[in-house]
Amino acid sequence: MNALDISSVTFCYDGSPAPALRDFSMAVADGRTHALLGPNGAGKSTLMRIITGQLQGQTGGVSVYGLQMPDSKALSFIGCAPQPISLYPSLTARENLRFFGAMAGMSKDQIALRSEWALAKTGLSEYSEAAGTTFSGGMQRRLNLAAALLHSPKLLLLDEPSAGVDPQSRNHMYDLLMELNAGGVTILLCTHMMEEAQRLCSGLTLLDRGERIYDGRMSDIGNLEEFFLARTGRGLRDL
């Protein structure tokens, strides 16, 4: 079974002369790690918002484990760490997790248990009572990931998860993501870091100007930077 199926999605913002996504399709098999790459403006963030039901395509559809979005059960399978960090800076780390756990319909006991686990896994246990205003950008990213993991999702959507994270914490995050995947969590990673994509992902979808221009195995590519340049005509500065 596929964890994610996107079928012929077209989406155009009001007033835009060209669609952000044009007849876009892709699939991610259950238990896989898949990277989403493309130049700035390729449609990556739009696609992530469509997957989570924040936007609705003018054509096509999205299903998660066979359930058509935005089905509530399908949404419960998804954990999302978006690029714009969705935390409340006036709350402590633990209070943020308590809030997001309640939004996910978790019981108080579940929230308490999973919060301890998520804080430990993201290296934030000692900062659990610290206010978000004291967190660095990298710490906020890690708390963003902790919130996404709180309800034990089957499909994890990550949009630039390691941006601003220090190298040591980034490696710790990579180890955690590989551990989660080994435990059966499917991961879709949207990143501008090619080394990150190659280290973590077995599959790759490449977008440019709203269209899919490659969809296949990472192992078939070789040098990802050269492949990206050849397919898009653009380099790292355009990511």
Q: Which role fits each region the language model picked out?
A:
Residues 131-135:
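Conserved ABC ATPase signature
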Residues 98, 102, 109-127:
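Conserved ABC ATPase "signature" region
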Residues 156-159:
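Catalytic Walker B motif of ABC-type/P-loop ATPase nucleotide-binding domains
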Residues 52:
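Helix-to-loop junction immediately C-terminal to a conserved catalytic motif
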Residues 1-6, 10-23:
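A short, flexible loop at the N-terminus of ABC-type nucleotide-binding domains that lies
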Residues 60-74, 214-216:
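Conserved ABC transporter NBD signature motif
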